[in-house]
Amino acid sequence: MALTEKQEALLKQSWEVLKQNIPAHSLRLFALIIEAAPESKYVFSFLKDSNEIPENNPKLKAHAAVIFKTICESATELRQKGHAVWDNNTLKRLGSIHLKNKITDPHFEVMKGALLGTIKEAIKENWSDEMGQAWTEAYNQLVATIKAEMKE
């Protein structure tokens, strides 16, 4: 299902707030992932030997920021472009990494829950069910693109 103009506006409005503190929001995203699914830390080499989210881990900080920024920026561009705007090499890499790490639907659902939780916490009183639906739809479209590449 394509994003509506209103959903696109909600994504962009919230992204304006989120991008003001990508380091904090990206670490929060990973904290929520590990909280919801502690076993998921074994997917990330830089978290395997840790019992908590090491906020001073430079590899985690860098990776988390890239993931968070990529998801959010891609989500805000979906309606305008009509699809995820990843180039072919990026898409192949995303498919390959997710396939290699045996990422399945439950993993994607944990990520979605963590993403929505992170955004809701950051947006505070500006959060709405409509905003949540917009982010859910955008995330689902991005994941569908990755899953399609995983099958190739």
UniProtKB/Swiss-Prot annotation:
The organism's place on the tree of life at top rank: Eukaryota
Quote the cofactor binding remark: Binds 1 heme group per subunit.
Q: Which gene encodes it?
A: HBI
The record's annotation in PROSITE patterns points to:
GLOBIN, PLANT_GLOBIN
- Provide the assembly information: Homodimer.
Please provide, in alphabetical order, the Gene Ontology terms of the cellular component aspect for this entry: cytoplasm; nucleus
Give the first-level EC class, as a single word.
Answer: oxidoreductase
Boundaries of every Globin domain copy: 2-151
- Please indicate if the UniProt record lists Cell inner membrane as a keyword: no
Q: What does this protein do?
A: Phytoglobin that reduces nitrite to nitric oxide (NO) under anoxic conditions (e.g. during flooding or in waterlogged soil) and upon root nodulation. Required for general plant development and during nodulation, especially for the onset of symbiosis. Monitors nitric oxide (NO) levels during early phase of the nitrogen-fixing symbiosis and buffers oxygen in functioning nodules. May not function as an oxygen storage or transport protein. Has an unusually high affinity for O(2) through a hexacoordinate heme iron because of a very low dissociation constant.
The listed location of motif Homodimerization is 35-39, 105-117
Would the keyword Transit peptide turn up in this protein's UniProt record?
no
Q: Where can this protein be found?
A: Cytoplasm; Nucleus
**Name by which UniProt lists this protein:** Anaerobic nitrite reductase HBI
Record EC number: 1.7.2.-
Q: List the cofactors.
A: heme b
Alphabetized GO MF terms: heme binding; metal ion binding; oxidoreductase activity; oxygen binding; oxygen carrier activity
Q: In which tissues is it expressed?
A: Root nodules.
Q: Which reaction does it catalyse?
A: Fe(III)-heme b-[protein] + nitric oxide + H2O = Fe(II)-heme b-[protein] + nitrite + 2 H(+)
Q: Which residues bind heme b?
A: S45, K59, H63, R93, H98
The family this protein is said to belong to = Belongs to the plant globin family.
Species: Casuarina glauca (Swamp oak)
